[in-house]
UniProtKB/Swiss-Prot annotation:
It is found in: Nucleus. Residues 500-560 form the PWWP domain. This is PWWP domain-containing protein 2B. InterPro entries: PWWP_dom. The gene is Pwwp2b. Residues 81-115, 143-171, 186-350, 366-408, 426-477 are annotated as: Disordered. Residues 239-252, 298-309 have a biased composition (Basic and acidic residues). It holds the Pfam family PWWP. It comes from Mus musculus.
Length: 600
């Protein structure tokens, strides 16, 4: 009889394993073997979803067992009680077991545990082999034995034997300082580092009797003097003070004057006038005295200039230098440094070169410093005895120089006189005056302009008590003469012609290339008439400011547009570019020729 759906067949239980039955059934000449599962357990077989076994749970109540699992050799047959079976099918099954049973019975497993001690998930038991990893990933709601957790091997850092575990390891690599600038640029950008006496590291307190020898020995020391100083044994402050006082009494010296020329482009030169021993030059200024606030007795101060040893700038730079007289840090806190102001002085109706005289401001913060007596003598063109004329100009972004009315020769000039009066007896280090620009130095015929106040300070020097307070020596003023000539057209070194009214690109340090219009062109000349520089006064588009730039720093707007234009800039930059482009269209060649035809 062929098996069909709905028929009932007697089966033989071969083995019982944790609620699962291994059965065999013979149907005619064929034999079938399989596993029957306990449908009351909702977990089902490994890898099968429980939903496939739910329909069989309805008929589970009709299944009953007539006996326990038969041992080997017995022929008991389990049959279902849901209906009568045909007799010809029952007799052969009882008489002899089927010969077509499982050829290889499963390996003997551990004996089944009692019903009360069954594990919660029947298909697996303690000691079962681990499933395949793919099966392990595809199964979810079943209990699957997991391998023991692996130990992750971590390499620990070796700690130093002489170091505490709680302390961090500091790197022992010694890095060299970055050399951002070369020696020439370093002395130009920061001239304080190249000065004879160190201005960046002043002493916290300086007294009246400190000597100059230590200051003058410092330039001769090597660069690693700090390392040598730390290795040498330290001396007490009293010993140093006594040595400085003894050394200061030997050689009284005049102040060191330093003039630094710097431009926004980072180029410039430094002119240093070192100190000289007193008595080498005749006194220039009349007697002056200064009372010390902490002492009753007057102390005198002898100041002498350097005569013929002045050296001019090493060469004329491409950019127009800016006259900037820097000063060191004030030496003491009890007496602030005196102030100087510049006043114009007219020599006569026929003179076209105004002279400016630097004077000490009489009172500062309400306390008088002493009698203010300026030099009665003023330098004319050829009366600068022992002092060379220094050519200088201004090249700042915000410098708007006011031109003098031109004379018959078409030349503007400026003489800058600085008196260095005595303040204390210990003036050896440096005495420099500070002016940010030449804006206040140049005026348009005004008798007295607003004073440009600079600082005049001095460092450590010797204390030289004099027998009489009336005999004192002072330093002659420092004279700077500027001779400029205004033109309407000039030719650059590379052969380009720059005229008044041209639209050009200009560069200021810290800003991108910016469009500008040339307002005026000035030629700076030395005493012998040789031009030293060419500068142009330009007005920036999109900004009310004007600047003086070197002609070599300007480039035509239209020709260099693709090279100078920055597409990333927005806002005022784009507005300035638009204004410059519109202005370029209006500057026709005939207009340019009209502007330059009145060239002198």
């Amino acid at each position: 009889m062929e098996p069909r759906a709905g028929c009932r067949l007697p089966v033989r239980v071969e083995q019982v394993v944790n609620g699962a039955l291994v059965v065999t059934v013979s149907c005619g000449e064929r034999s079938f073997a399989g596993i029957l599962l306990d449908c009351t357990k909702k977990s089902g077989l490994f890898g099968l979803s429980p939903s496939t076994l739910l329909p069989l749970a309805d008929n589970s109540s009709a299944v009953s067992c007539h006996g326990q699992a038969p041992e080997e050799g017995t022929g008991e047959v389990m049959q279902l009680e849901t209906g009568p079976l045909h007799p010809h099918h029952k007799d052969p099954e009882k008489d002899q077991p089927p010969k077509t049973a499982v050829s290889e019975p499963p390996p003997p497993l551990i004996p089944p545990v009692p019903a009360g001690n069954l594990p919660p998930f029947p298909p697996y038991f303690e000691g079962a082999p681990f499933p395949h990893p793919l099966w392990l990933r595809n199964t979810y709601q079943q209990w699957v034995p997991q391998p023991p957790p692996r130990t992750i091997k971590r390499t620990r850092r070796r700690l130093s034997r002489n170091r505490d575990p709680g302390r961090l390891i500091l790197s022992t690599i010694r890095l060299r300082p970055r050399q951002v600038l070369c020696e020439k640029c370093k002395s130009t950008v920061s001239p304080q580092e190249a000065s004879p006496s160190p201005l960046n590291t002043p002493k916290p307190r300086r007294r009246l009797g400190s000597g100059p020898d230590s200051e003058h020995r410092k330039p001769e020391e090597p660069e690693d003097s700090a390392v040598i100083a730390t290795a040498a044994p330290r001396r007490s402050k009293r010993e140093k003070r006594e040595e400085d006082r003894v050394a200061g009494e030997r050689v009284p010296r005049s102040p060191v004057i330093k003039i630094s020329y710097s431009t926004p482009q980072g180029k410039g030169e430094v002119v240093k006038i070192p100190s000289r021993v007193h008595g080498s030059v005749e006194p220039f200024c009349p007697q002056q005295s200064l009372q010390n606030g902490s002492q009753d007795s007057e102390v005198s101060r002898d100041v002498e200039p350097r005569g013929g040893g002045d050296r001019p700038p090493s060469g004329s730079s491409a950019s127009i230098p800016k006259l900037k007289l820097t000063r060191p840090v004030p030496p003491i806190s009890d007496l602030p440094p005196p102030k100087i102001r510049l006043k114009p002085h007219r020599l006569g109706d026929g003179e076209h070169e105004p002279l400016y005289r630097a004077e000490l401001v009489e009172e500062l913060n309400g306390c008088p410093r002493g009698p203010l007596v300026s030099s009665p003598a003023l330098f004319a063109d050829g009366s600068s005895h022992g002092l060379e004329d220094l050519s200088s100009g201004s090249s700042g972004e915000d410098d708007d120089l006011k031109r003098f009315p031109q004379g018959k020769h078409g030349r503007d000039g400026l003489a800058f006189l600085v008196d260095c009066p005595g303040r204390r007896t210990d003036c050896t280090s440096e005495s420099v005056c500070s002016t940010d620009s030449l804006d206040e130095l140049k005026s348009s015929g005004s008798e007295v302009t607003s004073p440009d106040t600079g600082d005049l300070s001095s460092g450590d020097s010797a204390s030289v008590p004099s027998s009489s307070a009336d005999t004192r020596q002072t330093v002659p003023p420092l004279t700077v003469r500027l001779h400029t000539q205004s033109v309407s057209r000039c030719v650059t070194e590379d052969g380009r012609t720059v005229a008044v009214g041209d639209i050009v690109w200009g560069k200021i340090h810290g800003f991108p290339w910016w469009p500008a219009r040339v307002l005026d062109i000035s030629l700076g000349q030395k005493e012998d008439g040789e031009p030293s520089w060419q500068e142009a006064k330009v007005s920036w588009f999109g900004s009310p400011t004007t600047s003086f730039l070197s002609i070599s720093k300007l480039s035509p707007f239209s020709e260099f547009f693709k090279l100078r234009f920055n597409r990333k800039k927005k806002g005022m930059y784009r507005k300035a570019i638009t204004e410059a482009a519109n202005a370029t269209q209006h500057v026709a060649p005939e207009i340019r020729e009209l502007l330059t035809q009145f060239e002198m």
